[in-house]
């Protein structure tokens, strides 16, 4: 399973790290991620601003994740 995690803070790092521990998850795409997520196995950072909803939609369409987890409040409020 591919998972998309939106955000770049400590909360999103913890979520992505835990998701990556599942044997069902083969890749976690983190947008934008941080230096810590860049070092984790099975995690891949993508430089997309969490407030740029059209870019996030393009990323989701390109990556086709089976699950998306939104960490920060800004993209939740933006839709």
Identify the function of each model-found stretch.
Residues 1-79:
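ATP-binding N-terminal substructure of ATP-dependent carboxylate-amine bond-forming enzymes
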């Amino acid at each position: 399973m591919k998972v998309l995690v939106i955000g770049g803070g400590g909360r999103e790092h913890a979520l992505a790290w835990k998701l990556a521990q599942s044997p069902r998850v083969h890749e976690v795409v983190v947008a934008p991620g941080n230096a810590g997520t860049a070092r984790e196995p099975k995690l891949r950072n993508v430089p997309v601003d969490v407030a740029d909803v059209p870019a996030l939609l393009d990323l989701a369409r390109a990556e086709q994740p089976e699950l998306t987890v939104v960490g920060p409040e800004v993209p939740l409020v933006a839709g």
